[in-house]
């Protein structure tokens, strides 16, 4: 099948699954199976379409029969299709068993509509249609938040972003006479994109991507959402915002230097602040949401380095920045899916998202524990996992940036490398905190003490994603060259070599060699260790005698107290008169429903 046929089939499966899951919502288990199987098949078709185009290194165009509008699949947006497809596949399978919980509501309609709209946004050949599909996707996501109160901030900020994007589209139409992306690209080679339109687009799409300080909705939306929904927020919804920013920045191929510098600065702020705020959180989903912000910043660092390379006309910097950013985009979606779904499995058996109320889960849920350890290590960019591979290439782009001709670039290169290293250290601390407090030690509550293994499909989905994280790191030398086809600019092969992380992995592994030999050769010469109760100075061991998440984060909290105090200023919406009113949340929910219904009717009538 051609890539266009695969996409048509995938979108059709998503839509059919959404409708049927809604019709059978009176039977929750059956609705879950319909939504899960349909979503999994649609995701497989989506990933296959992206893989076909990426390996062929040639873009294709055609029509999406269901809505009757032109689409294009380039090697660049094929990476988004692969990301959406892989994550959607395992989230859909996981969602089948998720529906078995008594407190879970049917979500097949919203999840499959979200996936269909996201795919349509990725392949849109018209910027206006891109914005409309992204709007439908975001509205579906609003209804996946746990309640109207937590979704109202997302709705308010999302409508602001849509308004800015609508103004940007109107200005583009006035200036260039079209919103077709191919025509815009050709015309902008003669008349470059104005910085006013670019700023409107970056703010509008930045609200969707959660770039700090436009991130206010992110922790609220993730905190108490269902695990499949939270996973899709981070791996699908926010990544569409990044695609919009990159698309605008690459139009015409003549971006000014300050665009790239602005993206680099925003990326560094988002990465550092997101990692810092994550460390002081104890709700695991809110913590992971802040870590999503950190990784959005890291991806933006890579994309910003690529845009800076365009301005400086340095093909090597373009390749390193874009390839590193795109690879980390894929990798982040994989390991963040592991973490959200793994955290959801723990909630499924314990009813707790506060890690202070857990502990000892590793013995109760060993499969989920090991998969979560892999995901946390990937999040901390530890080798040989996929989180390390993408960041390593981004580090190389900073080294290349420090050797460029522009003074500001030479200044930023070392500073960004140091900033990313500090952010990585915060991620390692957060990994130790989450895994140590949640999965090690003694259970702190009866629910944690009585936890059992997660259901089969939930465990299989989490483990499969963890295996993908390992493959993404170990197979990076073979996967990274494939992404070079996604760089939409002619490159000079002699000047765009990427140092493969495998060499670095071997260098890091060398110090471990003596310990490996000792473990193999020790035999029975050393006495085996005996285990007993922990010694606590003559007192009986109590469950409270364990390190807490609050105590673990306290040194960092004290060291960065001035930065942490900015949280209220970075999210000043609570100061808006009437914002805390309960009626406003319900009003926004109804407005979102009306807007979603209108947009769906328009799209369906267009297809008919």
UniProtKB/Swiss-Prot annotation:
It is found in: Cell inner membrane. The chain crosses the membrane at residues 10-26, 44-67, 76-93, 116-140, 153-173, 197-218, 229-251, 258-280, 296-312, 416-440, 453-476, 502-521. NCBIfam families: PRK08042.1. The keyword Transmembrane helix applies. It comes from Escherichia coli (strain K12). It comes from the Bacteria. Its main location: membrane. Pfam families: Proton_antipo_M (PF00361). GO terms for cellular component: formate dehydrogenase complex; plasma membrane. Disulfide bonds: none annotated. The keyword Transferase does not apply. InterPro entries: ComplexI-like_HydComp, NADH_UbQ_OxRdtase, ND/Mrp_TM. Belongs to the complex I subunit 4 family. This is Formate hydrogenlyase subunit 3. Keywords: Cell inner membrane, Cell membrane, Membrane, Oxidoreductase, Transmembrane, Transmembrane helix. It is a multi-pass membrane protein. GO terms for biological process: anaerobic electron transport chain; anaerobic respiration; ATP synthesis coupled electron transport; formate oxidation; glucose catabolic process. FHL comprises of a formate dehydrogenase, unidentified electron carriers and a hydrogenase (isoenzyme 3). In this non-energy conserving pathway molecular hydrogen and carbodioxide from formate are released.
């Amino acid at each position: 099948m051609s890539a266009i046929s695969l996409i048509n089939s995938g979108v059709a499966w998503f839509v059919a699954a959404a409708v049927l899951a809604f019709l059978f919502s009176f039977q929750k288990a059956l609705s879950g199976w319909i939504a899960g199987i349909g979503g999994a098949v649609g995701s497989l078709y989506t990933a296959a379409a992206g893989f076909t185009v990426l390996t062929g290194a040639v873009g294709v165009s055609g029509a999406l029969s269901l809505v009757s509008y032109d689409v294009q699949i380039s090697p660049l947006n094929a990476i988004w299709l692969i990301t959406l497809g892989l994550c959607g596949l395992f989230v859909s399978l996981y969602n089948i068993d998720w529906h078995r919980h008594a407190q879970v509501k049917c979500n097949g309609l919203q999840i499959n509509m979200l996936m269909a709209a996201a795919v349509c946004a990725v392949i849109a050949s018209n910027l206006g249609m891109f914005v409309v599909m992204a709007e439908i996707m975001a509205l579906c996501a609003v209804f996946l938040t746990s309640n109207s109160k937590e979704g109202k901030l997302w709705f308010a900020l999302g409508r602001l972003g849509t308004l800015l994007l609508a103004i940007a589209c109107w200005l583009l139409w006035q200036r260039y006479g079209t919103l077709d992306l191919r025509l815009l690209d050709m015309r902008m080679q003669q008349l470059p994109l104005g910085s006013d339109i670019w700023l409107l687009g970056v703010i509008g799409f930045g609200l969707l991507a959660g770039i700090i300080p436009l991130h206010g909705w992110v922790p609220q939306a993730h905190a108490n959402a269902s695990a499949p929904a939270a996973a899709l927020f981070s791996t699908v919804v926010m990544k569409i915002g990044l695609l919009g920013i990159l698309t605008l920045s690459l139009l015409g191929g003549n971006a000014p230097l300050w665009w790239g510098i602005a993206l680099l600065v925003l990326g560094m702020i988002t990465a550092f602040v997101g990692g810092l705020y994550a460390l002081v959180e104890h709700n695991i989903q809110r913590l992971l949401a802040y870590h999503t912000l950190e990784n959005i910043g890291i991806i933006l660092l890579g994309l910003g380095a690529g845009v800076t390379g365009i301005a400086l006309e340095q093909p090597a910097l373009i390749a390193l920045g874009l390839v590193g950013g795109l690879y980390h985009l894929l990798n982040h979606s994989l390991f963040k899916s592991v973490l959200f779904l793994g955290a959801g499995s723990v909630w499924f058996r314990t009813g707790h998202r506060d890690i202070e109320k857990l502990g000892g889960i590793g013995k109760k849920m060993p499969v989920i524990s090991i998969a979560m350890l892999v995901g946390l290590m990937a999040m901390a960019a530890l080798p040989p996992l996929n989180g390390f591979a993408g960041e390593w290439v981004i580090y190389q782009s900073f080294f290349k940036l420090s050797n460029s001709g522009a003074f500001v670039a030479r200044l930023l290169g070392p500073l960004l490398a140091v900033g990313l290293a500090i952010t990585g250290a915060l991620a390692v601390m957060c990994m130790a905190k989450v895994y140590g407090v949640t999965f090690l030690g003694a259970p702190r509550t009866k629910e944690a003490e009585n936890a059992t293994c997660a259901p089969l499909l939930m465990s299989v989905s989490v483990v499969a994603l963890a295996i993908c994280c390992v493959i993404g790191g170990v197979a990076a030398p073979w996967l990274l060259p494939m992404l070079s086809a996604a760089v939409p600019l002619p490159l000079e092969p002699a000047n765009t070599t990427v140092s493969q992380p495998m060499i670095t992995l071997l260098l890091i592994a060398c110090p471990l060699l003596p310990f490996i030999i000792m473990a193999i050769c020790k035999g029975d010469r050393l006495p085996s260790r005996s285990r007993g109760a922990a010694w606590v100075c003559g007192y009986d061991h109590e469950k409270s005698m364990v390190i807490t998440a609050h105590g673990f984060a306290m040194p960092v909290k004290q060291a960065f107290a001035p930065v942490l105090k900015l949280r209220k200023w970075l999210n000043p919406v609570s100061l808006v008169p009437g914002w805390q009113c309960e009626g406003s949340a319900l009003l926004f929910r109804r407005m979102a429903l009306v807007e979603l219904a209108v947009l769906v009717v328009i799209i369906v009538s267009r297809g008919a």
